[in-house]
């Protein structure tokens, strides 16, 4: 009788432990899940004929930032919060670096409807912008100029403002994809998410510049980046 009681207690304890661990495991999966979402955003906005990011701009970019599912606070209020990834060109233009995590806060995008979820993509077009981006904190429009990016097959219709900008940015919300200047938003590295992905609290600059091996979850995103870059070179 006592043995049967002990077995029941063991089973109950095991179930309780697995339930208590579920939120932790789910939280650990979030950065990997977000990488998949970032890859989906990149695939969709780069594949849209005449309505996406020009391939020649991606080819010239030093870094890219993708934030899937950026949340907007309320109608008429510009506050936003979201998490995403950045990747930069490897030295010698040999593909793209392992992704580093970012959080974006604040800023304003005028046409957004409050409470909506928005996908953001940014291309960093200058060395100055890419260097600042890898700091622990980076404010758009303050530490690097930002402009709404052009939409289309090529960037031949770029304005002077776009050509001079350190960063070009785009937004997709409720099916609408357009260039948008995300002034005042702050990008911060997320050491906790880096720890989850890499097993160490690595700084973004270290991940990008020291040849850190990308996690398996980043394979699709990096394959897309390399593929779209190669397409521009061969078209």
Regions found by a protein language model. Name each.
Residues 1-2, 24:
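Short linear motifs centered on Gly/Pro in flexible linkers and helix caps
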Residues 2-12:
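Bacterial N-terminal signal peptides that target proteins for export
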Residues 21-27:
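Sec/Tat signal peptide C-region and signal peptidase I cleavage site
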Residues 27-235:
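Small-residue-enriched, tightly packed secondary-structure blocks
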